């Protein structure tokens, strides 16, 4: 007596197809780094070799590109959130971007523009502040805001003191 086995079902997608579909679904929301996608695949229990094959294919067709991601991330976070070089580097590192790619993405930023962005952020906040004789509270809040965005203590203090004096002069006129 011979036992026959039915042919493998073609309606059930393979693990590789499922992993590819997951990656494509994640990429429709926003671009992601290779490390982020690998982490999501591992979190959902896909074997590492399946994840590597899927990610290699997505990289080959240009859907996953850490250099493009880093450049876009730096441009977006710099313009919208006012982040400093240090904060941007930390964010990219947390997303699994390689140090060389981070360095390349941040190479176009200069210190003068960073200080200018800090001044702009402080000016915007100061317009809404009610200034009193005691500047300590306002100064503390503004320095903390810049620190949260990754600016150094020195730059934050210098910018806040200068902009606070300029705002006081502006309001006197």
UniProtKB/Swiss-Prot annotation:
It holds the Pfam family RecX_HTH1. One of its GO terms (biological process) is regulation of DNA repair. The keyword Cytoplasm applies. Keywords: Cytoplasm. It comes from the Bacteria. It is found in: Cytoplasm. The keyword DNA repair does not apply. One of its GO terms (cellular component) is cytoplasm. Modulates RecA activity. HAMAP family: RecX. Belongs to the RecX family. This is Regulatory protein RecX. It comes from Mycobacterium marinum (strain ATCC BAA-535 / M).
